[in-house]
């Protein structure tokens, strides 16, 4: 709520000139943060040139909640709120409907593939389609709730296995996985 927003703004103000600490805005996900707060945080991030990190379209439960409350998918909901842009790091984006990934492309948000978490859920990110849409994407480890080892080499291996098991064409190459896991 308001107290957490005030704390986040205070944290940013205390560190905004730091050469080593770079605050970001990080609302959890579209089903746990109200539309009002999501918009407020997005506006604050844009006004202060901060990145925003959000877990987006991660689970079927999130999809069902957003569908029942907003009659759309989590990605379309975020897009309709105006919170997707080139400063957004969107973890997951693996429980999607037709048109969702195209909205990520249009908004220039940066999706993060969390292979271990997606593998456990049985719902890997469609990295080939993202690449066809010219959407840049990266590889991450997720949080302790979805992954308990934070091993980037294991995530890279899992990314190869998952992608190549669901790809309809053009398997992802190890060189590409290394780039996605290591570039800024």
Label the predicted regions.
Residues 1-93:
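Metal-coordinating catalytic core of metallo-dependent amide/deamination hydrolases
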Residues 67-72, 91-97, 118-123, 145-151, ...:
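A general structural motif
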Residues 80-87, 128-184:
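His/Asp/Glu-enriched, well-ordered alpha-helical/loop segment
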Residues 96-99, 105-127, 131-135, 139-141:
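A conserved active-site cap/scaffold subdomain adjacent to cofactor or substrate pockets
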Residues 44-51, 83-86, 103-112, 132-137, ...:
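Glycine-enriched alpha-helix->loop->beta-strand junction motifs that scaffold or abut catalytic
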């Amino acid at each position: 709520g308001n107290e957490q927003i005030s704390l986040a703004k205070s944290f940013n103000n205390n560190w905004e000139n730091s050469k080593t600490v770079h605050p970001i805005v990080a609302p959890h996900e579209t089903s746990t943060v109200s539309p009002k707060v999501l918009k407020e945080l997005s506006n604050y991030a844009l006004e202060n040139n901060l990145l925003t990190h959000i877990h987006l379209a991660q689970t079927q439960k999130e999809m069902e909640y957003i569908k029942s409350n907003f009659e759309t998918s989590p990605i379309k909901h975020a897009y309709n709120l105006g919170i997707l842009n080139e400063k957004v790091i969107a973890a997951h984006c693996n429980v999607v409907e037709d048109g969702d990934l195209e909205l990520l492309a249009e908004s220039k948000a940066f999706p993060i593939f969390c292979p271990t978490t997606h593998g456990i859920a049985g719902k890997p990110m469609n990295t080939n389609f993202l690449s066809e849409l010219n959407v840049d994407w990266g590889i991450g480890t997720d949080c302790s709730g979805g992954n308990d080892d934070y091993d980037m080499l294991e995530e890279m291996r899992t990314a190869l296995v998952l992608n190549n098991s669901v790809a309809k064409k053009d398997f992802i190459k190890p060189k590409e996985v290394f780039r996605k896991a290591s570039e800024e």
